[in-house]
Structures are given as structure tokens and as C-alpha cells.
């Protein structure tokens, strides 16, 4: 009776030999070309893009803008994301950091006529993700990387990377969890010769990428 009652609240009971049998994980690193804007800013610490002036007058602001120049200001990465989303009609989760990245990813999904769900600091709406097999779920790390069961999908694309190891590791577990019966696929969009390569290396070591590491790097 207790099990029946718990089932009504969403509990799942499994045989003992099923509990630890998680599916295989396959990781794919997609290297995208860097831009002349990134190289100029890295050298001069100053650049104007459209009407936005980026000034890296401290190590923290330089690190921030190098991250943004690797993602939201890199049209090569945008094109790579579009290609990936075009290649599947399955549910896909896209992790990102900044609001401008969200706007760019939304625009791509709209052009591809993909239904969207979002989890971020402003909104949490999983309706399309639950109901549409081809939905793209846009997840901001702080809001979506921990605690959620998103195993309706088995595919995650990393448009940009977090700095915190815990967010990175937990984000992968949103699909790789008990009850998932499909192989889990992860795609990392990494800009060549950029800060992203350093961040990815540190995250894979289960360490946070800090301002101190940035200052000690050759970037």
C-alpha cells in the first residue's frame, strides 16, 4: 500500500539489479574558429562591436569579455549550433550563461521552427519540453544545472561553459540518471585558441576556473 501511495506522488521503484545501470555517455568536442575581434580584444583589452564597447580594464572584466567573444560574439559558434539543431528532430537541451546568448539561441530555434522551453532566472516553462518531441530546452546554468529531471531528452549541447565545476558536472546528470534508457550524448562547442579551451580543461579536472587561474594563464 505504501508503494502504491508513493507511486501516486511520482516515486519509481526498480529492481536491485537495475538501480545502478546507467546508460553510456558519449562526448563530442566541436572546435569552432576564433574571430579577429577576439584576437584584437585579447591584445588591446578594448573593442567596439556594433554599439557595445568592451573594456577589459581588470582581469575580471577581461575574462568576462573573452568568454563572451568566444560565444555570443562568435558567428562561427552560432553557425555550428544551428547545424547541430538542424541535424535532429529529438528533444535537445542547450546550456548557456548570458542573456544575450539566450536571445541568439532563441532566434536560431525560431528560424528552424523548433518549439522552445526555458529555465532561467526569469522563467521556468517546461510545457513544450514535455509535450513536443522536437523541443529545444534553453537552460541557464544557475537555474537548470542542478536538481531537475530532464531525462525526456538524451542530448545536451553546451553553447558556452560555466566556471564552476559543480554546475558543469551536475548539468550532465540532468539526462544521465536512473530511468534513462538511451545513450546520452553531449556536444561541447569550443572556440579554438580561446579562453574556452582553458576553462574546459580545468572543468574536466573537476576544478573551478578562477580569476587566479586566468591571471596565471598565457591568454
Give names to the regions the model predicted.
Residues 148-161, 184-188:
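A short beta-strand element within the Helicase C-terminal
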Residues 118, 126-128, 148, 163-170:
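Active-site-adjacent loop/helix micro-motif of nuclease/hydrolase catalytic cores
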Residues 93-95, 103-106, 110-144:
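Conserved helicase ATPase core of P-loop NTP-dependent helicases/translocases
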Residues 1-90, 186, 201-205:
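Inter-lobe coupling linker of SF2 helicases/translocases
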Residues 163-219:
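A conserved SF2-helicase RecA2
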Residues 137, 155-157, 175:
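Short, well-ordered beta-strand core segments
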Residues 41, 101-105, 167, 198:
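Phosphate- and divalent-cation-binding pockets in alpha/beta enzyme and binding domains
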Amino acid at each position: 500500500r505504501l508503494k502504491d501511495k508513493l507511486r501516486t506522488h511520482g516515486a519509481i521503484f526498480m529492481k536491485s539489479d537495475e538501480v545502478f545501470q546507467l546508460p553510456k555517455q558519449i562526448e563530442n568536442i566541436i572546435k569552432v574558429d576564433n574571430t579577429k575581434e577576439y584576437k584584437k580584444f585579447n591584445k588591446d583589452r578594448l573593442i567596439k562591436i556594433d554599439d557595445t564597447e568592451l573594456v577589459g580594464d581588470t582581469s575580471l572584466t577581461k575574462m568576462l569579455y573573452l568568454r563572451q567573444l568566444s560565444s555570443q560574439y562568435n558567428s562561427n559558434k552560432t553557425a555550428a549550433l544551428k547545424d547541430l539543431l538542424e541535424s535532429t528532430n529529438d528533444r535537445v537541451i542547450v546550456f548557456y550563461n548570458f542573456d544575450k546568448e539566450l536571445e541568439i539561441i532563441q532566434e536560431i530555434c525560431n528560424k528552424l521552427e523548433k518549439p522552445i522551453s526555458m529555465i532561467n532566472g526569469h522563467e521556468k516553462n517546461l510545457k513544450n519540453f514535455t509535450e513536443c518531441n522536437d523541443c529545444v530546452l534553453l537552460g541557464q546554468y544557475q537555474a537548470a544545472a542542478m536538481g531537475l529531471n530532464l531525462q525526456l531528452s538524451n542530448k545536451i549541447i553546451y553553447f558556452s561553459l560555466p566556471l564552476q565545476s559543480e554546475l558543469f558536472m551536475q548539468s550532465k546528470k540532468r539526462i544521465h540518471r536512473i530511468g534513462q534508457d538511451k545513450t546520452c550524448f553531449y556536444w561541447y562547442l569550443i572556440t579554438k585558441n580561446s579562453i574556452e579551451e582553458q576553462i574546459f580543461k580545468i572543468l574536466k579536472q573537476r576544478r573551478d576556473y578562477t580569476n587566479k587561474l586566468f591571471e596565471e594563464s598565457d591568454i
